[in-house]
Amino acid sequence: MTHPPFLYGTAWKDERTAPLTRLAVEAGFRGIDTANQRRHYFEQGVGDALEGLYREGSVTREDLFLQTKFTYAGGQDHRLPYDPHADFPTQVRQSFASSLEHLRTDYVDAYVLHGPSVGRGLSEADFAVWKAMEALCREQKARVIGVSNVNLGQLRLLVEAAEIPPRYVQNRCFAANYWDREVRALCSERGIVYQGFSLLTANAQVLGGPEMVALARRYRKTIAQLVFRFAQQVGMLPLTGTTDINHMREDLASSTFDLTDDEVRLIESVGAS
C-alpha cells in the first residue's frame, strides 16, 4: 500500500503501547511506526492492539501501513530479539522474524535500519545489514526498506552503494537547521520520502514565538496543526506520538487547510538563527 499522510509513533509507551495504538487507530491513524527494540518500544503491544482490532472487524491488515526497525545491539538493552554473537545478516533475519510474530503479520510495509552503527560514514556492518534488508525486500516480506537517524554524508553513501535504495528516511527534525533541509533535499532528489519525528518536542522553544502564535490565530489552528501541515506541504511524512485523544484528532485534521508559500517559508526558517 502507499503510505498514509501521517504515522503514529509508538516509542516510549511501554505497557501503554497496546491501548494507545488502539486509540490511535480508532481515531483514524492508518500508519503505525514501531521497532523491535524493547528498550524504547513494545512492539508486541502494537501487535496485541492490532489483533483485537482485526478480530472486531474495525480494520484489516490491508488497511494499515506497518513500519518497524532493526536495531543494533548497542541500541538495545538485555532483551535482544536476536543472537548478538551471530553475524549481521542472521541478526536481521532473527529480528525480522520476531517482528512478524509480534505484529501478527507475514509482511511489513516498511523495514527500517534504526540507525548506522557509527556516527560518521557507514561501516561494513551497515552494508551487511542493508544487504540482508534488501533480501527481505526481494522476498516481498518487507515491501520497502528505509533508514533512520542518518546524516547527509551517510545517506549519500547508502544511496550510491545500495542495490535497492531506501524508500524512507526517518530523522529527528530540528527547526534550527531548517527542519533538516539538506537531507530533505537529497531525499527529494532521489525520490525518497522523508519522515520527520519529534517535530514538536525538539522545537518547543521556537514554536511558541510571536510569528507562530499569530499564524495559529489567523487560521484558528493549534501550533501543532501548523507544524504538521507545514511538514506535509514540504513533502514530509510526519510522525506524532501523542497520548491524548483530542490531540490525535487535531493532528489528523492538519490536512484540512493549506498554508501559503510565504507561510511555509516562514515556518521553515522559524528556528534559524
What are the residue ranges of the model-derived segments?
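Short, acidic/polar
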Residues: 13-25, 85-103, 153-156, 178-179
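N-terminal binding-site loop/beta-alpha segment at the start of enzyme catalytic domains
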Residues: 1-68, 128, 132, 202
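Acidic (Asp/Glu)-rich catalytic clusters
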Residues: 23-26, 47-65, 100-106, 137, ...
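Beta/alpha (TIM)-barrel catalytic core signal, keyed to glycine-rich beta->alpha loops juxtaposed to Asp/Glu
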Residues: 115-273
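Structural motif corresponding to the early beta-alpha repeats
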Residues: 57, 61-89, 114
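A structural motif
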Residues: 29, 105-108, 142, 166
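Active-site groove signature of glycoside hydrolases
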Residues: 100-121
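Active-site mouth loops of central-metabolism enzymes
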Residues: 3-16, 78-90, 118-124
